[in-house]
Structures are given as structure tokens and as C-alpha cells.
Amino acid sequence: IGAFIRQLDNLITLHQRKFEKLTNVKKSMLEKMFPQNGSSYPEIRFKGFTDPWEQRKLTEFVEFFSGLTYTPNDVQENGTLVLRSSNVSNGEVVDADNVYVNPQVVNSENVKVGDIVVVVRNGSRSLIGKHAQIKAFMPNTVIGAFMTGIRSECPEFTNALLNTSRFEEEIAMNMGATINQITGYMFSKMEFKVPCLDEQKKIGEYFEKLDRLVTLHQRKPFLMKWRT
């Protein structure tokens, strides 16, 4: 039994190291595959793409949708799930402190696969801009009023863009000094360098695969510990 536990510990450590390595790779590639310091050209590109990236307002290539405002009286044990900041962790939608409301009070649209949900108001300043992409069909699920939803033609690219330091800088520049929130008007002022749609798709596919690997090695140690 002792040998088995040691072997399991070694496997857990291996997955933790792979997770850390892949996280560092992702951070590095976000810097190299997106233009830096005002440049119109990223350091690394896929073959066949040479055109400069264009400066565009965020509102030119994404659409926003609002969250649901509800009262304590609307909350019940089951019904329509309302995604809040607690449901966003490490770029994923998770089950955590779930809130359900009576479906009859829901007047906002259901989330769709590919949607990106973003925390736009929170008591903790560091949580503003935290986001996750909807990866699977989630029936009877909306976002809360302190969230905003983003839809785009290439959601994987948009999700990667929101993971860049440039998005963090835009949030820091636009966020109020006293109120921890990003408004629709603030989003409308944000500008980013973006490539043509075909290059967006290539970049989006790359980071989607990388995210799957990161998630795999992040979950493995937890599952191994849980099974023991």
C-alpha cells in the first residue's frame, strides 16, 4: 500500500508540474501571439499571415448582453441558474455557491455555447474582468446583473484576447477610482489590435487546445486525491 501511495503522489506531482509548465507556456504565447507595445505585428504568427493587425473598438467585433436583476424573493432551491462571479474560476464556469431563481421572473436570454461571461461589478476590485467561456450547452442558465455576456464571430480568439495583459490594462484605465465596475460605456471605449477573421480562427484554435491541456493537468491531481 505504501508503494502505491508513493507512486500516486509521484503522478500527482507530475501533473502539477505539467500544469505549471503549460500555464507558463500560455502566458508566454499570449505575449508572443498578440502585438505588444503599440506594434501592429505579433512576434509569432501562423504561416501565410503577414498583414498588420488593425486597431478596432471592442464593440466593432463583439456584441454584449446584459444579466438578470432579481430579488431575494425570486431565489429558490432549483429553477434557472444565475451565473455570478463565484461561478467563474480559472477561466471556467464552475459549480460554486449556485443561485437559482423562479423561471417566471427571468427576462434575460439564456447563455449559449461560445458566450464569454465577464464579471463587471464586484466588491473585490481584483475580480473585475474575470471571465469564462461557455463550453457546453447550459439550459435554463442566465448571467446575473453584475456580469456581462460577450458574443463574437470567433469566440475562442475573443476569449484569448481577454486573457492578455492588454485587456487588464484597458480595465485598469477605464475602471472608476471608487466604484469597482466596468460599464457598457467603458467597454465601448476599449480598443485592441485584431487580425483578419482567418487568423483569428487559427489563434483561437491554438489557445482552445492549450486551455484543454491546462484544464486536464489541473484536474488530474484533484481527481487522484479524491479517489484515494
Over which residues does each language-model region extend?
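A short beta-sheet element
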Residues: 84-85, 96, 103-165
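DNA target-recognition patches
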Residues: 71-102
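Short amphipathic coiled-coil heptad-repeat segments
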Residues: 17-51, 219-228
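A short glycine-rich beta-alpha junction/loop motif
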Residues: 141-145, 176-201
